[in-house]
Design a protein with these regions (language model features):
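N-terminal leader/capping segments at the start of a protein or of a new domain
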Residues: 1-71
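Short, solvent-exposed loop/turn segments at secondary-structure junctions
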Residues: 86, 114-116, 123
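Structural signal for conserved beta-strand scaffold positions within catalytic alpha/beta enzyme cores
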Residues: 8, 38, 75-78, 155
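Double-stranded beta-helix
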Residues: 144-181
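Conserved short histidine dyad/triad with adjacent acidic residue
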Residues: 75-100
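Short, conserved beta-strand element in jelly-roll/cupin
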Residues: 98-118
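Conserved metal-binding segment of the jelly-roll/cupin
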Residues: 127-147
Length: 181
């Protein structure tokens, strides 16, 4: 079940609120300019699936997003607990960073924890299959896939180079809860 935990930056151990209803999550994130939608991930995709397999299975949804928002690049991140670089990838994604463009993710399998640092608050969004999240350009955030990742997410970009992170150098991510395996 998707959820949203909202923390004040001074209280990383105690959330101000925890939401589990889709409408509540979507409206709370919309107040911060973050899009949170539920799309149908109908194809049976397992973590570890190839990029070609995932894109082929979800071409209709990808085309819709690309047309709707003008995205020009798409890729897939598909990780399971056997991935040889899971520790390195987790460490990189756990560093607070921002992008010069919106960060769009459509989860077609598994789950991951997207954590957004907006002003004095931290929004921890547990994304699961069928969740689409679009984080506005410039928003500080990090992503936790857990010690034993199990997810597939389609990523869309305005930048032809794909995923380009600008790391903040802040250690805030280490103070907040991570995805529990």
């Amino acid at each position: 079940m998707s959820s949203l935990s909202v923390y004040h930056v001074s209280s990383p151990d105690i959330p101000n609120k925890v939401l589990t209803h889709f409408e509540d999550i979507a409206s709370t994130l919309a107040e911060q300019g973050v899009r949170f939608d539920r799309w149908q991930a109908a194809a049976k995709i397992q973590p570890g699936a190839s990029q070609e397999e995932v894109i082929s299975a979800y071409q209709e949804q990808i085309d819709k997003l690309m047309t709707e928002r003008g995205y020009i690049t798409v890729d897939v991140i598909s990780l399971n607990s056997d991935h040889p670089q899971k520790a390195e990838l987790r460490a990189k994604f756990l560093e607070e960073h921002r992008h010069g463009e919106d960060e769009v993710r459509f989860f077609v399998a598994g789950r991951g924890l997207f954590t957004l640092h907006i002003d004095d608050y931290v929004y921890a969004v547990l994304c699961e299959k069928n969740d689409l999240i679009s984080v506005p350009a410039g928003t500080k955030h990090w992503f936790d896939m857990g010690e034993n990742p199990h997810f597939v997410a389609i990523r869309l970009f305005n930048n032809p180079e794909g995923w380009v992170a600008n790391f903040t150098g802040e250690d805030i991510a280490g103070r907040f809860p991570r995805l529990e395996d």
